[in-house]
From Swiss-Prot:
InterPro entries: PCMT (IPR000682), SAM-dependent_MTases_sf (IPR029063). It comes from the Bacteria. It comes from Burkholderia ambifaria (strain ATCC BAA-244 / DSM 16087 / CCUG 44356 / LMG 19182 / AMMD). One of its GO terms (cellular component) is cytoplasm. Belongs to the methyltransferase superfamily. L-isoaspartyl/D-aspartyl protein methyltransferase family. This is Protein-L-isoaspartate O-methyltransferase. The active site is at 157. It is an enzyme of class 2 (transferase). One of its GO terms (molecular function) is protein-L-isoaspartate (D-aspartate) O-methyltransferase activity. It catalyses: [protein]-L-isoaspartate + S-adenosyl-L-methionine = [protein]-L-isoaspartate alpha-methyl ester + S-adenosyl-L-homocysteine. Residues 35-46 have a biased composition (Low complexity).
Length: 310
């Protein structure tokens, strides 16, 4: 060891307290900046202690990156995204229009203007939600006076025809037991359930029979009994009936149905050719055990009355 270096060891106490050498200070400009910023931050404590919630927006310290989530998170929870108006706006409005009582009341007003006068029939038409018995794609037309397809080449009858047939069957009476031929989607049976104590309805097309059960289930109608079978045969086990309503047109009224009509009972049915050009709404009254009286009323158009089941 040279004499010059020997003089430097051991180091004195004052040599340990001296400023670091240039090689120790050069650790990067960022650290020098941070070191100089520390005393400045200590001089301004208000900028650090001011809470975000009081100001409503995050404030960044000078010389720092404002976008870093660790120091200034964006208050996303305070600004929830608005719901997209595309799907929800149209559906609820349409559903409200269909289920509102005002829409059904307007339909009832049209029925009254067309000559339906029995208040019980009008109340029954107002009580049953027709849109629940048609396909969703046709729901906007549910309260128009129009027959609508329900599949299997069958239709749901016009509201005016349903009201007219039920009013003819009632004739101001209180009905005890009613037979419907051709359940279809179940709409007319639902209306009949409001004016009769017991409603029996027969459907020969199995898918429609199942569909009617599904349509009626939400309404919780306790006095409807659905049957899968041949409507032309009727339902002898439940006869006699105060009224029989046939929702399909035949060339004549089956004798089996006439026999199941009670004395004083009324049967309402479309009668005529399958083309529909000569179909007439017909009223048959049983005036004696072997005597029936027939009246021909309005021109109508119905699907054909067929035998058997499918």
């Amino acid at each position: 060891m040279s004499g010059e270096r020997a003089k430097r060891f051991p180091l004195a106490l004052e040599d340990l307290k001296r400023a670091p050498r240039k090689s120790e200070v050069r650790s990067g400009s960022g650290e020098r900046h941070a070191a100089s910023a520390v005393p400045k931050a200590a001089d301004k404590p208000a900028a650090v202690l001011k809470p975000v919630a009081k100001t409503g927006a995050a404030r960044a310290l000078p010389g720092t990156a404002a976008a870093k989530p660790a120091t200034a998170p964006k208050p996303t929870v305070l600004k929830p995204a608005m719901p997209k108006p595309a799907a929800p706006t149209i559906a609820p409005a349409g559903a409200f229009a269909l289920t509102s009582e005002r829409v059904r009341e307007r339909m009832v007003e049209r029925l009254r203007a067309n000559g339906v006068t029995d208040a019980r029939v009008l109340d029954a038409m107002a009580a049953v939600p027709r849109h629940m018995f048609v396909d969703p794609g046709l729901a906007t037309q549910a309260y128009e006076d129009a027959a609508l397809p329900i599949g299997h080449q069958q239709t749901i009858s016009k509201p005016s025809v349903v009201a007219r047939m039920i009013e003819l069957a009632m004739a101001g009476r209180t009905l005890e037991r009613v037979l419907e031929i051709g359940t279809g989607c179940g709409y007319q049976a639902a209306v009949l359930s409001h004016v009769a104590r017991d409603v029996y309805s027969i459907e020969r097309i199995k898918p429609l029979y199942e569909r009617a059960k599904l349509n009626l289930r939400p309404l919780r109608v306790p006095n409807i009994r659905l049957h899968y079978g041949d409507g032309r045969v009727g339902l002898p086990s439940a006869a006699p009936f105060d009224a029989i309503v046939i929702a399909a047109a035949g060339l004549d009224v089956p004798q089996a149905l006439l026999e199941q009509l009670a004395i004083g009972g009324r049967l309402v049915a479309p009668v005529g050719a399958q083309s529909g050009q000569h179909q007439v709404l017909t009223l048959v009254e049983r005036v004696a055990p072997a005597q029936w009286r027939e009246s021909r009323l309005d021109r109508v158009f119905f699907v054909p009355l067929k035998s058997g089941v499918i």
